[in-house]
Amino acid sequence: MQEESLAASCLELPKDGTDWSMNILKSCKRIYTALLSLVLLLVWSAVAMAAAPDITADAAIVIDEATGQVLYEKNADKREYPASMTKMMTCLLGIQLMPPDAKVTISQAAASTEDLPLHIARGDVLTAEELMRGMMMVSDNGAAVAIAEHIDGSAAVFAERMNEKAQEIGMQSTHFANPNGLTDPNHYSTPHDMARLAQYAMKNPVFRDFVRQKERRVTWIAPSGKSLLAKNTNELLGRYE
C-alpha cells in the first residue's frame, strides 16, 4: 500500500503526545501522494511544462508542499465552499484531542446525516482511529459529526473550535459552520487557506498515515464483528512515480 507521487501539493475547490501505534511513512514522495487524496487534482503534466493549465474549476491553487511556494493559482483568494476538504480540519483536531482507542458512539444526529458510505448507524461504536481512518478514506459525513460530538458535545460547538484553529494557523478567509463540509452560507474558505491547512496537517505523521492508504477494513467495536472494506476515493494514489 505504500505509494509514491510528485513532490508538489495541489488543491482545487469543487462544487500532542498521544501514543499512536502504527507504521508512519517517512518518504517525502509518499507524503505528497497522501496530500493528493484530500482534493481534486490539476493536470501535473501542464505544471511540469510551465504552461498555464486549462481547468474548469472556478478557483484553484498548486503549491510546493515543502516551501509553500505557489506554482499556479486561479482566483486563489476567492471564497468558495470547501466541501469535504473540511474534513482535514476535523481529522486533525480529532488526532490532537482524542486517544486512538477512544470509543466513539454514533448518535442519531450522526446517523441521520446525508451521505454515509461507512453505513454507520445509531448506537454503533468504533474507536476514534477506525472512525477517522474511514472518514478520510471515503468522506463519511456522519463520521465527522460523531467525532465533533465526542470532542465537544455538538457539531456547532466543535465548529467554533475549528474556527479557532483556523485563525491559529493563518486561515484568515475561512469560516467553518460544520465538521463535514455540507453546504452552508456561513461555511467557506479559499484555495490559499485550504493549501495552508493541508500543508499544516501534512506535518502530522498520523494524519499522513491516515490519508495515504489505498484501502482498509474498518472494524467496529459494536456491533461485534461488523466491518467494512473502505477504498480511498483518490484515484491518483499510485499512478505517479
Q: How would you label these PLM feature ranges?
A:
Residues 33-85, 100-102, 159:
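Beta-lactamase-like hydrolase cores
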Residues 53-57, 155-241:
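Penicillin-recognizing serine hydrolase domain
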Residues 72-93, 103-105, 126-134:
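Short active-site loop at a secondary-structure junction
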Residues 74-80, 115-122, 130-134, 144-153, ...:
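Second-shell loop/turn segments in exported
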Residues 96-109, 205-213:
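Short, well-structured active-site flanking segments
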Residues 105-117, 184, 214-220:
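Acidic helix-start/capping segments at beta-turn-to-alpha-helix junctions
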Residues 114-145, 227-241:
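Conserved catalytic neighborhood of penicillin-recognizing serine enzymes
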